[in-house]
Amino acid sequence: GYWSDHWDYNMDLVDNYLSIFPDKLDELVFKDNTYKFYDSVAYVVPRSEKYVINKKGAVRQYGMEVEDEAKLARPGFNKWATNWLKTPDEKIYNTTLAVKMITLALSKFAQLDVDGMGVEMEGGKPGWNDAMNGLPGLFGSGTPETFELKRLIKFITDNFNGSETVVMPAEIAKYLDDVKAVLDKYNNGQVSDFEYWDEVATIRENYRESVKLYLSGEETEVSKDYINEVFSAFAAKIDKGIEKAVEMGNGLVPTYFTHEAVDFEPVVDENGNPVFTWGNIMLPEGKKPIVMSQDDVCYYEYMDGDGFASRMVIGADGKPTCEMKLDDGT
């Protein structure tokens, strides 16, 4: 889900099931190969497309996800139906709950904020509290999700042991190795908090790009012992972040954080003009948007007129239009 806590309830289901069938853990987690990956039409864009400077000169995070045009154009893909991630031969990829857990925990770990305290709201929505809808634009992160991540990782480290292997998509195995390699550098003092965050965020963005349309179908066998080693290292990093949050809150853990960019450079073209994010137009001062949905109204009013109007471009006559130019020129 777009909301940063939509994944929290998964462990409730696992815990409830195992409270009744504790002897079925191995079958539930490792043996059942009928799980699939939901193939969403929405795509969380990289930082280069969502980090913007508003008219007040402050850096914000807007337009965090888009509907992927290439995916929509794919034969058989229906944005209003349930789609499952496939391999290039158009076969649905099946996997185990173990791999689903690894993927979820890895992706959330890779979304920890620059201080390692909260999970970033980079999907554009906060948690259950909609009154906090402005937080994602302020580089918001939340500690409730950090504790849920700690809970999920504890399940992995408690139950993934031994020389037996877990078969997973090659892209996920690479994602796991790449994040662990940067964490090793961080633990050895080779990179700062900011450099660690930047490198891991880049790895996350590259992973998303690699699986955006398909999984390759290539697989990698990873031992449970190695998985345990990696996630134990992740858990140690999380614990340090929680300690930092407790210290910041004078003994109480803050629920949310916002972040402010104190040093930045605007991206300009060869003529020195600002580069705008494709697909979103910053409204010039004094201009009003064409309202296309209630969400647009709410967002525009909430941002005090300093926001985006989705799916709009400026036409040849200088007026806004709902048309959208695709990469192929149509």
What are these regions (language model features)?
Residues 1-330:
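Acidic, mature catalytic/reactive cores of soluble proteins
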